[in-house]
Amino acid sequence: MLAAIMFCGFTVTVLSACSSDNDDKTETPQEQTVKMFYVVEVSDDVLKVADVEVNYVDQTGAKLKEVMTSKEWIKALDTKTLPLTGGIWAKITPKSAVAPGDYQLKVTTAAGYEAKLANGKSVFDGYGSDPEAAPTAAQTAEDVAAWCAKSPIVGFTVSKEGYAKETKVDFGRNDDDDSDNGLATDICRWFLSKIGYNPDDC
């Protein structure tokens, strides 16, 4: 079962993490597998006023980029190697001409993994921003630019034993706010529903 282990605040969004450790008796040794998950979701208005480039760390440790063309972006990656570091950041850049208006801006960013270990244990952990947080209202180009600069970075490192801790991943952004913290129930349920797992496991 998944259980919330932490809940902390962040300047722009509330960030959190949850973990699961199946402590049943040890089973016959099996091949170790690890699946990494990344999710970015934005409100409809974000793509009207900004360009979104998803920056993430893949299973080899390489930093890759993909342009976000719809309001939801999901990536699943497989590896058999631990330790590993995961990280994601939605780089949000205001469009060159943003007309005055009533924009509701929101980005939800989450990252997690499931490790099925050789000793038979299965460990899940994840980190992300609060999907229930209210959007930010913006009326001017300056408002939009200020909001774009606050897109959070989510990063974690998984030890060779399969357990994660929050870590800083440098994507070269110009905002020094931290994005640490653990996955509580709301973000846990949202995240599992996005990656095809049962939200009731939270």
Q: Model-derived features: where do they sit?
A:
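Bacterial N-terminal signal peptides that target proteins for export
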Residues: 1-5
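Bacterial Sec-dependent N-terminal signal peptides
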Residues: 10-37, 176-185, 199-202
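Extracellular and analogous surface-interaction loops
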Residues: 28-30, 72-84, 156-162, 169-174
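Post-signal-peptide N-terminal segment of Sec-exported extracytoplasmic proteins
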Residues: 37-79
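Short, solvent-exposed S/T- and G/P-enriched segments that are highly enriched in secreted/extracellular
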Residues: 62-82, 123-138, 151-152
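Mature extracytoplasmic domains of secretory-pathway proteins
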Residues: 64-117
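C2-type phospholipid-binding modules
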Residues: 106, 110-131, 135, 144-147
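C-terminal partner/receptor-binding element of secreted or periplasmic proteins
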Residues: 128-201
